[in-house]
Regions:
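Membrane-interface transmembrane helices that cradle and orient dolichyl/undecaprenyl
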Residues: 131-133, 171-193, 223-227, 303, ...
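Hydrophobic, aromatic-rich transmembrane alpha-helices
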Residues: 18-28, 123, 295-327, 335-339, ...
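Short periplasmic/luminal acceptor-recognition loop of GT-C membrane glycosyltransferases, typified by
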Residues: 85, 213, 217, 301, ...
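Membrane-interface alpha helices of multi-pass inner-membrane proteins
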Residues: 188-206, 212-217, 245, 338-346
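Hydrophobic/aromatic-rich transmembrane helices and adjacent perimembrane loops
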Residues: 210, 342-378
């Protein structure tokens, strides 16, 4: 299998050479548009390959969603077997697709799916810009996000994140909106699929809803204007039908599987608690701090700053001539997408850089609007980005002889098996469930075992909040339902967020602790993780393990 060391010099030089060709091709109009797009997507895939073959966790969310996918392949009923908290079911079902085709669910397969979403989003945005601003503007503007996404090595933009699918769906709705913006005859077929894609977004990630609403409102306005002109209401009706189709089918499935109460309690009410983060007045400062956490996104934003300012000036500048609908609707929609993207990135109050995925494409849309009459000058933006990445790589090469942040030699292109997972495999077999108390979801991925509780971490069962008892009750109910072969108490130095064994370990929660001690035997403690094995599994496998309170630690 393909591997990369820390300094694949020739590979990197080829990447920069291809990037230069892409930038030149963006202004060389004689090159066919399809050939230009092939070059751009080829560059993105080429430079993303080191991160894809690096088969290790880059972000805890990756392991969380991959664990969900492993579980859904075994028990495909979301909200019964899996609860992704703010992450919707579609994000997790997407990761099951490689398994259906015979591939392992791991970090490599997850990043391939993320890359496909990224490619799709780019193509949709290019098509929308081409429709709204013309091909010459679209080609020049398109190179900026391509260069950014191809050369960034910041983990939050290369790992599979819960924003990639909703952003893909969002850009699909933007492209469909562009198809009806200036049309004398609005296609009901297009409005149906626009509504369908928008209706799916709340079930990919709840934070994407504000941006979905912006596009739907724009489409509603166009359909209403069309109705006023023609008295034809089919596009409007089909938009509404499309928007209701996926939620209606989902609710039928929810009722068929008797999980409506779980949906209400844990997807609606549970996430309402999570949404109580930043207030409106705190959002600007929160967003500023978030952007500063990502040097690459900061440079991306600065490179687009002047075109964005031009776009704002053009939007609010008084016009002496009568504007077409597109002259009003397009910039208004894009500005609202920017504002809702900022809101979605900050409302939770958490400074997670991958939330900035909601802002990448609205940024470039407003920049493209700003330079549509002087598009060739915009070549400065991708050049600034390319020089930024080249400068960083040159400094890194000089200081550490390193170009690649995702070294995959020495077995790093294969799924790891940590000492904890090696120990638990003595007591498990394919098809078993396992449970991790605390937050260390990578153990599920390494063991390739389904999670025995709907949440694969216990953060919402541990921390104080109004629904803590409900989460604890479901946790215990899930343990009784799935009867996991092993339980890990991972609260400790290697756990995310929950590290205090004295107050957060499993023994601090009597109902759960009583069940564990009644049905499980403490086998060992490895890397500050306590391993419990189901008693009947010990007997079945004829393994003699005495209950111990203090055991070896590796």
């Amino acid at each position: 299998m393909l591997t990369f060391d820390n300094s694949p010099t020739v590979y990197w030089l080829l990447g920069y050479l291809l990037a230069g060709i892409v930038i030149l091709a963006s202004v060389y109009q004689k090159l066919p548009g399809k050939a230009f797009l092939v070059l751009c997507i080829g560059l993105l895939a080429f430079m993303r390959m080191p991160a894809i073959v690096f088969n290790r966790e880059l972000n805890a969310d990756e392991s969380q969603m991959l664990s969900h996918a492993i579980t859904l392949y075994q028990d495909p009923v979301y909200w019964r077997s899996v609860d992704g908290t703010t992450i919707g079911p579609l994000d997790n079902y997407l990761l099951v697709i490689p398994k259906i085709f015979g591939f392992q669910i791991d970090y490599t397969s997850g990043r391939v799916m993320g890359l496909l979403c990224c490619i799709g989003a780019l193509l949709f945005v290019f098509s929308a810009m081409k429709k709204w601003f013309g091909e010459s503007t679209a080609r020049v503007a398109f190179t900026a996000p391509v260069i950014f996404l191809a050369f960034t090595q910041e983990n939050d933009f290369v790992h599979y994140s819960s924003e990639q699918l909703p952003v893909f769906l969002l850009t699909a709705t933007i492209w469909l909106l562009s198809r009806i913006t200036d049309s004398k005859q609005i296609s009901s077929f297009i409005t149906f699929f626009l509504g369908l894609a928008a209706g799916m977004m709340p079930f990919a990630k709840l934070q994407s809803v504000p941006q979905a609403m912006v596009v739907v409102l724009a489409a509603l306005w166009l359909c209403y204007q069309f109705y006023n002109r023609t008295r034809e209401n089919k596009p409007l009706i089909f938009l509404l039908i499309g928007g209701l189709t996926f939620p209606a089918l989902l609710f039928l499935w929810i009722f068929a599987n008797n999980i409506f109460q779980d949906f209400v309690d844990f997807y609606i009410l549970g996430n309402a608690i999570y949404a109580g983060g930043s207030s409106f007045t705190e959002i600007p400062s929160q967003f500023y701090k978030l952007v500063l956490l990502s040097y690459d996104f900061s440079v991306y934003s600065l490179a687009l700053l002047i075109p964005i300012i031009f776009g704002l000036i053009q939007t609010f500048r008084p016009s002496t001539t009568t504007r077409k609908a597109a002259d009003f609707l397009v910039p208004t929609t894009v500005i609202l997408l920017i504002l809702t993207g900022i809101y979605s990135s900050t409302k939770s109050g958490n400074s997670f850089i991958h939330y900035l995925n909601f802002c990448i494409y609205p940024w470039i849309l407003l920049a493209a609007y700003g330079i549509k009459s002087r598009s060739k000058w915009f070549i400065a933006a991708p050049l600034i980005l390319l020089f930024w990445f080249a400068g960083n790589d040159a400094l890194s090469y000089r200081r550490e002889h390193r170009l690649n942040a995702f070294e995959s030699v020495n077995g790093l292109n294969k799924l790891d098996r940590s000492p904890v997972v090696v120990a638990l495999t003595e007591f498990t077999k394919p098809g078993d469930y396992m449970v991790v108390w605390g937050w260390q979801c990578k153990y599920y991925v390494e063991a390739q075992l389904a999670q025995g509780t709907a949440e694969n971490h216990s953060e919402r069962s541990i921390f104080k909040h109004p629904m803590q008892e409900k989460y604890l009750g479901r946790y215990l109910s899930d343990l009784k339902r799935t009867k996991p072969a092993v339980i890990l108490d991972a609260v400790g130095i290697y756990s995310l967020w929950v590290q205090d064994k004295k107050t957060q370990g499993i023994d601090n929660f009597p109902a759960v602790a009583d069940y564990v001690h009644q049905h499980y035997t403490l086998v060992s403690t490895i890397d500050d993780v306590t391993l419990y094995v189901r008693k009947d599994r010990l007997i079945t496998q004829q393994v003699t393990v005495l209950p111990i309170l203090a055991t070896t630690s590796h």
